[in-house]
Swiss-Prot record:
Top-level taxonomy: Bacteria, Pseudomonadati, Campylobacterota, Epsilonproteobacteria, Campylobacterales
Superkingdom: Bacteria
Role of this protein: Cell division protein that is involved in the assembly of the Z ring. May serve as a membrane anchor for the Z ring.
Protein name: Cell division protein FtsA
Chief localisation class: membrane
Classification via HAMAP family: FtsA
Gene3D superfamilies: 3.30.1490.110, 3.30.420.40
GO biological process: FtsZ-dependent cytokinesis
GO cellular component: cell division site; cytoplasmic side of plasma membrane
Coiled coil (residue ranges): none
Location(s) in or outside the cell: Cell inner membrane
Amino acid sequence: MEHKEIVIGVDIGSRKICAIVAEFKDGILRIIGTAHQDSKEINSKAIKRGRINSLAHASNAIKEVINSAKKMAGLNADEDRNNPISSFRESYHPKTKAIVSFSGAYTESIRDVTGVASTKDNVVTIDEINRAINNACAKAGLDNDKHILHALPYRFTLDKQEVNDPLGMSGTRLEVFIHIVYTEKNNIENLEKIMIQSGVEIENIVINSYAASIATLSNDERELGVACVDMGGETCNLTIYSGNSIRYNKYLPVGSHHLTTDLSHMLNTPFPYAEEVKIKYGDLSFESGAETPSQSVQIPTTGSDGHESHIVPLSEIQTIMRERALETFKIIHRSIQDSGFEEHLGGGVVLTGGMALMKGIKELARTHFTNYPVRLATPVEKYNIMGMFEDLKDPRFSVVVGLILYKAGGHTNYERDSKGIIRYHESDDYIRKAHQSNPTPHIHSSPTERNLSDLKTPSAPLNTAKNDDFLPIKPTEQKGFFQNLLDKISKIF
């Protein structure tokens, strides 16, 4: 029986919830189902400015989106014998697992943390890299109520000589420099509750700005240094790369929702009508004082229940939106300056997310970011992605596509993820393997129930922990070669 694995990506945003169902088969990523809800369908009590306000409302909204995506993929069609896609479910694990986005509103970060490990036989193995990263995480001194989401290496030295990839190299002292993103454990527990109520199990958690950058940035941009800004409804999330590694991330509580709020307040019109005005007449390229068509817009007046209206010049509408958008770019720019990497953005500024769809936003950004290039980004095809990808080439879907690509190998090399697993790329044959420091397998497999560790995708997880703290972990003795061989033979038979 052919091996297939299903994974679901779920992006939980303030103004939008998206889900993608993807199939992994023979190293190919195929999207087979998608669904999303926008702000008109999501209960306002569910999520506010990236923060979950109600477990019940949030789980209901997420469950509805996931079920819609699964239905499109045929995953709810067990009894439908005429559905040609339902037959593939026989080879899937019965539990639905999801890669879930995590709002930067909940996160903090620690920069430039170092960890050291000594080699045993004068050769760097994955165990030494694991120990060095764990030592760095311990050195960060996080309290027990904190949970590390990402520990992202950006530099290695071996015997005080800088190296790009230390695996397999000869040396005695390995040092790693990492960027840590963490959150409160309570936030993780609440997210787990929501996803369980939504009918899925969390396989991994990825901060939304990181996922967006995976889906949109090129290798050249990451290497040169680039600021990726995911511009959403109520938040903007900034990620800065330098030398192909994440060096800075920041949550900013501004977004396109604030343009709507300004229009509602300054034009004395109800919020839903202000949103319609923004979508229909929004043009950020207009400058105050510039020539514009003599056009006016009739809009309802607040408090009149739609019985009264007034006329507003189009130029006034566009000026209000432009001023708020400029203020947003000023806030983003200040954060870039605070990062210390403003002079290292050879790849420029990349804008994605729903707000990036606004007419004239790239031109407006260029008037503010004058020292480097600006481009608008949609998800790009990577890792042999197939299926319904054409429908997702939209900046609104950068995060959810990035979640799937993270699973397919788009992560940072030697990253320690939210589950305490070291993920790395094998440059020789790009065959994914499960190398474990614990002799107990992290994922069980059988001839009829296999997992992604058998697929030819450029990613290999290393289980580094059983505890939830992800702090120092004592390495356990690995099985020998012949014992591993016997174990594999016994599983076959």
